[in-house]
């Protein structure tokens, strides 16, 4: 007669509850936004004051018109110096990127990570019903990954 184990059956590891990890759950909703007619130097001040690298450009109805970044401001400063032109009359509308790609707020945040890698953007606006509702950044995606703790990539 063989040896019997008295330990019993091993318990199955608990699976984490399935929680959808949507872009809307990690996006930033309180945004620093800019206006199309805003002066570039005012934008530079806001970027520095708030410690951000760029932001969305909206109209009075909060509709997305474009994105302005530190890089766009740097180009303007460089061009102004090169052509010896004052920067007082230069507006966001002249330097912003107006063909803006957005991400759906209902998209899985890990699918959004793939888009960040493919497009090489630092941020994506989220628009619903033609209204800017938020923005997701690479840092927001990293926060979602921390929540998973890399133990499993299922959610």
What does each model-identified segment do?
Residues 1-155:
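Tandem CBS (Cystathionine beta-synthase) repeat/Bateman regulatory domains
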């Amino acid at each position: 007669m063989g040896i019997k184990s008295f330990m019993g059956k091993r318990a199955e590891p608990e699976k984490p509850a399935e929680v959808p990890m949507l872009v809307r759950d990690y996006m930033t909703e309180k945004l620093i936004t800019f206006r199309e007619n805003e002066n570039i130097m005012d934008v530079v001040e806001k970027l520095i004051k708030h410690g951000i690298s760029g932001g969305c450009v909206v109209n009075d109805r909060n509709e997305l018109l474009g994105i302005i970044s530190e890089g766009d401001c740097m180009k303007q400063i460089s061009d102004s110096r090169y052509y010896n032109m004052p920067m007082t009359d230069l507006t966001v509308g002249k330097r912003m990127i107006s063909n803006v790609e957005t991400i759906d707020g209902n998209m899985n945040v890990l699918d959004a990570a793939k888009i960040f890698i493919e497009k090489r953007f630092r941020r994506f606006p989220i628009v619903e019903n033609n209204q800017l509702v938020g923005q997701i950044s690479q840092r927001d995606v990293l926060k979602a990954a921390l929540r998973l703790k890399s133990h499993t990539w299922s959610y």
